[in-house]
């Protein structure tokens, strides 16, 4: 038999095998993470669709450090994209600063838990909450701060209240969101807008003056600053799928 037909059959077989392999390869490379969130394995600060950047990813805390220090305080850990602590420790702050931004994350606390996420924080004071505004994280049903709506879950801590009945019970995951565009800021919890305000306006100025924050002249004044995660309260805290994007 001539060698030419054999060569033609071999070439056809190789071509068919290559075409069959393409869908499988495409499926592996194009897999998307659920809910549009950045996959947990993505490196911190790697931009994803829509300009989102993951702040907690894989087993890395590369985007974070301790308040007024370059190292990560003991007591914080991140495993498979979940940041956690089980005891009181020093606060974390983001290495980057943000002015106008949108921040999303999921969180849960142990029974009686109390924590917070700060934004536009600076480091001239002993604590970040003396300069940065706080989105309160709380087990409303069991923590003392749950007795006041001004210090309940989702509140603009000490200034603007959050309604009752939105936060989930202890040890269940909540979804939170902050939108900050210039003076306008919104706090969201589990798909519901809980509070919004205009920073530096007359109402805001009056509320700050009537609060404990009046003792710190720089409180809430920065247009740009660090994000922070409160660690100084006892108890369990877990955060996952935390991501941020700049707004224009």
What are the functions of these language-model segments?
Residues 3-14:
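N-terminal secretory signal peptides and thylakoid transit peptides that target proteins
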Residues 25-248:
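Carbohydrate-interacting regions of secretory-pathway proteins
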């Amino acid at each position: 038999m001539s060698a030419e037909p054999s060569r033609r059959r071999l070439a056809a077989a190789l071509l068919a095998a290559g075409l069959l392999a393409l869908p499988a390869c495409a499926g592996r490379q194009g897999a998307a993470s659920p809910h549009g969130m950045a996959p947990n394995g993505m490196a911190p600060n790697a931009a994803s669709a829509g300009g989102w950047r993951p702040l907690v990813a894989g087993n890395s805390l590369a985007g974070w450090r301790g308040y007024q220090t370059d190292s990560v305080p003991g007591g914080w850990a991140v495993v498979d994209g979940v940041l956690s602590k089980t005891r009181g420790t020093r606060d974390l702050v983001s290495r980057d600063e943000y002015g106008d931004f949108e921040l999303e994350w999921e969180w849960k606390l142990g029974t009686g838990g109390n924590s917070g996420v700060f934004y536009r924080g600076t480091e001239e004071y002993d604590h970040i909450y003396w300069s940065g505004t706080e989105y309160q994280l709380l087990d409303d049903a069991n923590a003392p701060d749950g007795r006041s709506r001004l210090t309940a879950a989702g509140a603009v801590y000490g200034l603007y209240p959050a309604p009752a009945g939105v936060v989930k019970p202890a040890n269940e995951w909540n979804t939170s969101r902050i939108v900050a565009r210039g003076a306008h800021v919104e706090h969201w919890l589990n798909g519901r807008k809980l509070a919004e305000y205009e920073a530096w306006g007359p109402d805001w100025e009056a509320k700050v003056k009537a609060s404990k924050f009046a003792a710190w002249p720089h409180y809430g004044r920065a247009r740009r600053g660090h994000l922070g995660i409160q660690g100084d309260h006892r108890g369990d805290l877990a955060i996952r799928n935390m991501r941020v994007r700049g707004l224009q």
